[in-house]
Amino acid sequence: MSHWFHRNPIKPTEFVKFDLKGVLTTDTCSKICGELRLRRDKLVSQFKNASNDLEEVTKEFNEYLRLFAGFLIEIQSSMVELENKDAGNKNSKLIPLIRFKWGNSMLPQAATEVSDTWFEALSMIQCMAMWLTKHAASMAGKDEVRESDAKECLQCLRQAGGMFQYVKDESSRLSGANEVEGSDFDPKVMETYILTATAEAQEVIVARAIEMKHDDGLISSLAAVTASIFSKADQCLNNLPDESFARWRRYLQLKHHFYLAYAFAFLGQKQLSEDKCGEAVRACKQGIAEYGVAKEMAAMYATATGPGTRIKPEQHLFFRRIEPLLNRHLEKAERENGFIYHQKVPDEIPQLDVEATYGLAKLDSFTYPPPAESWNTAVYSAFDLSKANMPDFSKIKKSKSKLDPVHEEKIYQTEKDPSNSSGCVIA
């Protein structure tokens, strides 16, 4: 069996010393910078393994952001709130003092750099969001997936989507961030990450609805919404180069057609229960057609260029079960229609309900955590800018040197078929 979720590489970055020398006029200032160096290095290392403990990685992530807050905003009191838009927070005087270099998930050969601490903060939040999606995949890949694992998978995807949204909303802080096509700050790429996390969270809900045997109409509608979100994600990447983005796009396309197949399958089942056999025949035939396209996309995905994991979703039980399900429904609809109903089979494709009013995945809004207790007005004032080298205020630019890719641990995936009725490991 193969992974159900495609995953792009984690962002690489250059080691940061936080060596501000004469700017640090007190032991507390030096301690903050020394701790930032250690915490950053540990956090970046944690991102290499998707199976690391969620609570531990989240704690390390929040502690780093809290300690880093004084490099983002002026510390006016020990209880300053970074997210309070009405508090009149000013940018920190420390923003331009350190140069940060980060790579991009989809452009392994292109690193960007700038002397701006918001570049560091937003890049780190992106990294955490990417790790959360990978952790979700590791939860879905266990030999035995319990309900708590499925909930953690859903939680991670919702949190990741909220973080991606936060980065997109705050990216206007960075001059030139959106000028590097295909970078992680390209608006098209950021929106694709948001939509992909949303669609994959929706997948968990669809699987749960199937497993719990909810109303066929509801399942059809949820699957149709999921297909629509995957399609929107794919369309965001329309004009980006195939050599970097083809594999990601084929993944989004196969998921789009796969969930259309499920939507038509359950629409057909609903119509059968309502004695609308002619319409059920048409829905099942359309579902079979969509499944055929999904298989074609899976084959194209296998040879597509671009970074990231190479998965085989067509070998997954959840994928394999849809074809016999459609065939059973079609055979029953045709048989009953031939014997009893004699209804005309419509030529037009049935309309799917994409207006589901409940059961939809909502992203968890991300809020930057408050500054660490180490920060107060006296500590902030003790960073002496008169001792700093002249900052570089230029906008983000491509780095002349490359960054090595992150050597990530392989995400474990069970070889066992799920024992549940839906065939989905995340139900």
Curated annotation (Swiss-Prot):
Residues 1-427 form the BRO1 domain. InterPro entries: BRO1_dom, BRO1_sf, BROX. PROSITE patterns: BRO1. Signal peptide: none annotated. Belongs to the BROX family. This is BRO1 domain-containing protein BROX homolog.
